[in-house]
Amino acid sequence: MDKTQTDTGMARRTVLSAGLGAGLGLAALGLAGCTPSAKTSGSGSGWKQFSGTTINFISENTAPSAAIAANSKPFEDLTGIKVNITQMALENLVQKVKLDMSGGTSQYHVVYADPYQVLAPLSQGLTDLNQFVNDKKYPPVEKGLADFIALDAAGRFESKSKLYALPYDCPTMIWMFRQDLFDKYKSKMQADLGFDPTPSGKITWEQYYQIADWFNKNAKADVPYGTGHQAKQHDSLQCDFSNVLWAYGADYFDVPDIGTVGSQNPGKSTLTTPQALDAAKFYDKLLKVAHPSSTTWDWDGLGNAFAAGQVAMCPNWHEYAATNEKSLPGKVGYSILPTGPKRSANNWGGTGIGINANAKGNEQGAAWLFVNWATSPATQVMTLKSAKGGGTPTRTSVYDMAEVKKAEKRPSDMPNMLTASAVLEAWKPENIGLRPKVATWNQLDTIVYTNLSKMIAGSQDPTTTMQAMASQFDKVNG
């Protein structure tokens, strides 16, 4: 297996819900430009005990995994362990992990455990990492578990007694906009619309719609459309819609902690409340003024379109800042998403990495050393700097580092940190958007984006759409 083997499919993933109360999570791992001297602290204390072992890591196509695949030598030098990394679209990863675990095999020892599509439905196939954390024969987790953001959301299911993954990445949906175009047209836009159009949490979703429509009608010489969306019939559509659903004060279920530790029994869906119906009606209206190719774009398609100058603004995952800075250097601004009748809600898409419980003997120990190293502060900083990656740290201590804080302003050698102000605001409890972490989410997710696709195609009205979703949710969950 080639170390950088990839499967065709979408880059970057879906994801979104993490824990707030326990510390929200940021994400990413670290490796770019990493040298043996930048290894995890405590090197030489238990790192070589599985030397000669080979392990396989299966991951979604993500920035941190790309960075580590490009530079895993520091880990191999530190441990003597060879790691093969396979990257692919999330939906393909889910199927491969299911087959591996259900078959009692461990072709993949380390697993990218998306909280909704892997961790919740397959938690029984993952090793409880507490056994390694509490065993002194292994190097300690640097700075301890308390340093992780969103440990519950990314690493646990149903209970805090078991830990299935360590937070690895944390893409979060924010408002990306062409700062240069807003600067150019601000006065004219403000005069026409009657409000200051500067992107911020003070702008409502209704005003966002008006801004998009204004660009469509008044700025064609500079940009084809005002807004773009990841509205393909795919998980990305559910992600995009969820921001609006939560902003309007609605949700999928009414269960405490369902977005953090999750639940096996979410009960009846709450998708037919007046707030949910209003959210669907607004989203349907918004897509009518969006770039028409929005219905063909997932997050990666949208990211490429924004970087190519096709839209003036969009809601997208903050890790696309690195791409923006390459294509539109100095021309992009970032804010939390607009506010609905209830709040601003910003989808959190963090994920942890865990260990296949089918792995045997030295494979388990070697896999843990990789999980520990890949989520360490030093590795996350290296990933931030990587030309191949550019991850999103999941450690509080990383955000407190002077060099990382400096990178929040241009010129920056860590372009994803240019979003820090918006992202840290998005992670506040009142602003974060957390999907329900339930074992049936793969089925529910499909129900959401299938019905939404019918709605935005004009074959199903918003009220019928939400009623259909709710009915199908309840049928799946019994």
Residue ranges of predicted features:
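N-terminal secretory signal peptides
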Residues: 1-11, 22-29, 373
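Hinge/lid segment of periplasmic solute-binding proteins
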Residues: 42-47, 115-174, 240, 333-335, ...
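Short, polar/charged alpha-helical segment
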Residues: 62-82, 180, 448
